[in-house]
């Protein structure tokens, strides 16, 4: 190691004073607080890596605050690419396929999503609350009219004038877990999806969904 012993010693003393390490019979070891700090560091490092990985798409959003850092801590990132353009979109299909309840916000409508929702609602009575932009609802009512289930139990649809190119979804799974996810849209469809089951991510997305729902108007298809 090229670091001077005096530098190492000074660093250890500072960690001791902070209560992060203690001297034992076999040398220095992390305290309980030290273990927590290390865990937080690795979570932070993972979040930074995830943010940098999707920076190309985050930069397309009109507001940098639309997605908070907690969505990346412990999150799973899936990106579309030239060899698998539907890869990110398939993540959302998979989410809906194992859900017992879905709450979401979407600026767009995709055939794969519509078909999956229709199947789950008809077959399993999937509880669904969705907020669509006005343009997305028009697309749903015209291009995908054959998939629309009128007066379906447990399904509530809302309309809001405009939405950013960001889809949000809060999914309750059959195993009792709740998962938060977001997808970034471009003219070529969904480019990246991030999924996260952490309490902070779920709490943020629940609050965002409720905020959009309060601004929207419930409609009958």
Short names for language-model regions:
Residues 106, 132-134, 184:
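Short beta-strand/turn micro-motifs composed of small residues
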Residues 134-174:
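HKD-type phospholipase D/PLD-like phosphodiesterase module
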Residues 111, 162-165, 189:
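Short acidic/glycine-enriched loop/turn segments that link adjacent beta-strands
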Residues 1-44:
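Basic, Lys/Arg-rich alpha-helical nucleic-acid-recognition elements, primarily the DNA-binding modules
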Residues 34-61:
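Conserved segment of winged-helix/HTH DNA-binding domains
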């Amino acid at each position: 190691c090229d670091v001077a012993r005096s530098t190492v010693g000074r660093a250890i003393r500072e960690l001791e004073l902070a209560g992060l390490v203690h001297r034992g019979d076999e040398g220095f070891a992390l305290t309980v607080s030290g273990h927590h700090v290390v865990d937080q560091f690795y979570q932070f490092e993972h979040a930074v890596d995830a943010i940098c990985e999707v920076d190309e798409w985050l930069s397309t959003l009109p507001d940098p605050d639309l997605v908070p850092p907690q969505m990346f801590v412990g999150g799973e990132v899936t990106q579309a690419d030239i060899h698998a353009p539907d890869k990110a979109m398939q993540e959302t299909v998979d989410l809906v396929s194992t859900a017992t309840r879905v709450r979401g916000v979407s600026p767009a409508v995709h055939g794969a999503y519509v078909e999956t929702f229709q199947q789950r609602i008809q077959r399993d009575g999937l509880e669904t609350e969705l907020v669509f932009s006005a343009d997305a609802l028009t697309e749903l009512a015209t291009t995908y009219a054959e998939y629309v289930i009128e007066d379906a139990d447990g399904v509530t649809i809302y309309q809001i004038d405009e939405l950013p190119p960001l889809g949000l979804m809060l999914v309750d799974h059959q195993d009792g877990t709740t998962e938060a996810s977001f997808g970034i849209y471009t003219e070529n469809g969904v480019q990246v999806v991030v999924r996260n089951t952490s309490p902070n991510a779920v709490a943020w997305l629940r609050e965002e969904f409720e905020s959009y729902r309060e601004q929207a108007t419930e409609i009958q298809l």
